[in-house]
Amino acid sequence: MYLHRAPRRLTIMSIALSLALPALAQQAPPSLAAGAAVKAAPVDDKTIQKVEVKGAASSYDARRDDTASKIVLNHDEIIKYGDTNVLDVLKRLPGVTVSGASGRGGEIRMRGLGSGYTQILVNGERAPAGFSMDSLAPDSIERIEVIRAATAEYSTQSIAGTINIVLKKAITKAQRELKVGMAGGKGIINPNYNLQMSDRKGQLSYSLTVNGFHNRFDRDTPSVDEGYDVAGKPVLYRATVFQEKGGYDGVNIGPRLNWTFANGDTLTSQSFINAGRFKRDAQSDEMTSIGARPPYPSLDWKVTNENYFFRTDLNWVKKLEAGAKLDLKIGGVIGALRNDSWRDAYLVRGGRHLLDSYVKTRGTDKGYSSTGKYSTPLFEGHALSVGWDGGYSQRDDSRKQNEAELFAPDDKLYPTYRPINVNEDYKGEITRLAAYAQDEWNVTPRWSVYAGVRWEGINTAVRGSDFADSKSRSSVWSPLLQTLYKLPDTKGDQVRFAITRTYKAPNVQQLIPRRFTSTNNSPTEPDYQGNPALKPELALGFDASYEHYWGEGAMVSVSASIRKIDGYTRQGIVLAPDGRWIQLPVNDGTATTRGVEFEAKFPLKSIMKNAPAIDLRANFARNWSSVDAVEGPNNRLDQQTPFSSTLGVDYKLGQLITGASYSFRTGGPVRVSDRQGIYQSARRDLEMYALWKFDPKNQLRVGLNNVLAQDFISESSYRSDNGIVKSRSVSPGVVMLRATMEMKF
């Protein structure tokens, strides 16, 4: 087995800012599912959060010039390290972290918060349930926008912030490019390809992007369960060997057509097709040396999963008199999910077959949407826009679980297991409507103000075969204010301030009282069940920042933020009347989160005239939070990442471009409730890349990921009147080598 060692701590000197501000509270609407969230307005054209007078287009910088704070990562930065997974790109962005072990997916977090606090959009909209961000290839992305403070044009379900991933669109010249790559490490092999084609013929332009990948893995995840009574005496020790192998195949297709008419109007058709197939074979063997044994120490799993997603939009932009513009968009989406899971149980590996279990899940998503925005200069110095966002979404799910105990264990040391047989169906519908108005006012050449208000209303209806029907109707008003002031007698110094009202609505899985069972049920391996009484969370936020720009590509910024959250949701664990442990979401009072961030990036030539072509970048984020209903210390909100940092360097020498990035995030213990606890190890990632240009049409990109090969350790614990139980697992780190040949033709 392994030893649990505390990682070394990193000492960082940073500027500490703190704000203490009051909070507001208001009922906010529940949401049906991640895929049915409020849809944002189009993102293809410039939004009104831009200063109206910017000078030459070549000098425009969204980070510097937009009144509403936003960080934009362009396509060249996205593909720099040769990543095949968009999550690996996001973890290098300032103030963004991805939880979990490197290369195993994870949750995207801003300000150290995930679980719905960070809003993730694709082309301004949330994808439906079943769509995996892991399947989105970086080559298909045009840009990534990190929006720290909410704006009225997007849904305000963004307490921590919004990350908007904008897919590629047509360009003005013909282009054909093929990329063929291979990535591999211990037990992992990932071949992939990307084809991009675009051209223009008269008033019509088109583009087509195709990405494909074939990922295979073979890995172990060992774990240990320990228990102690109130006197500290060991009452449980169980070691588990978990082995799994399988793969994931996927393809993404993105066609786009654009017509430009003589009067300047445009009509755009854009679609996105995603298909993926996952397969996994796994086995686990539990060896108990102290305490009670589980019902079935040896288990075999086989899982297959297929998901399909198709979205299409038609966007018409009409230019009107006096600089006004009308932007209309309609869209439709369909998706399907097929999941099959087989589970066989034994007392010992190779022994008598005791339990046979099969779970069949089927799901479909469909919906349509409509958005519109009218924008006009209105008065001198003002950029006003009003708009709407409406739609309908439907989710149908069926789940059948059939279990048969073939033989009961003869040994009385093994607890009795009751086979579970269920046949469940549910249908969820959501009808939504949002309206907003926003204005950006250039008060003076140095001072601009953004003000907006958004109303969102949502009606939900959920029906199921094993729970009572439920309906809800709710709405929320979100007033928003942001301002940018460029300090006098300076060329590049400016300050920002923002006040936002945002919220977090529960998703459909959190609301439906349908139970998902575990085989060896315990406080650290509970069943899961939704809570129909769950309420949304509402937050009042304040952001402030100082920025200094002193040359092309050179800047430094310091920012601070605070969020006061009412109706905080945590995961509780209860013992049901049938004797099984159940985890379910519950509202538990208020919570507060504060944070400071520091970012700097600059070419070395900006401070040393004759320096080589080296670009440097660094960012640090420190977060604090507390949940009022949970006694400290370590009563952090949503397992918040306390500290994260990234250091990077890029160097160009002739035909060679190379660089490296080092990321660090702390972990540590978290008190979820007076009885529950969680621990995660600190995480260190070192990545390197090199790009060699053979000629203008051919180049080779090589990258190394997770060079330090650090293991990821996580632990959960539950304390009762009889003592404490802990479960600790290790995800081994793997160094990944990537090579991609890029060819234009």
Walk through the language-model features, giving the residues of each:
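Gram-negative outer-membrane beta-barrel transporters
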Residues: 444, 449, 555-569, 582-670
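N-terminal periplasmic "start-of-domain" segments of outer-membrane beta-barrel proteins
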Residues: 50-81, 106-109, 115-118, 171
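Surface-exposed extracellular loop regions of Gram-negative outer-membrane beta-barrel proteins
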Residues: 336, 459, 471, 485-541, ...
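N-terminal periplasmic accessory domains that precede
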Residues: 86-89, 106-109, 146, 158-180, ...
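Outer-membrane beta-barrel signature, preferentially recognizing the C-terminal barrel domain
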Residues: 301, 305-309, 424-431, 501-557, ...
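Extracytoplasmic beta-strand/coil segments of soluble accessory domains associated
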Residues: 87-125
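Short acidic/polar hinge/loop motifs at secondary-structure boundaries
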Residues: 98, 109, 125-150
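Conserved C-terminal beta-signal and adjacent last beta-strands/turns
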Residues: 2, 497, 540, 605, ...
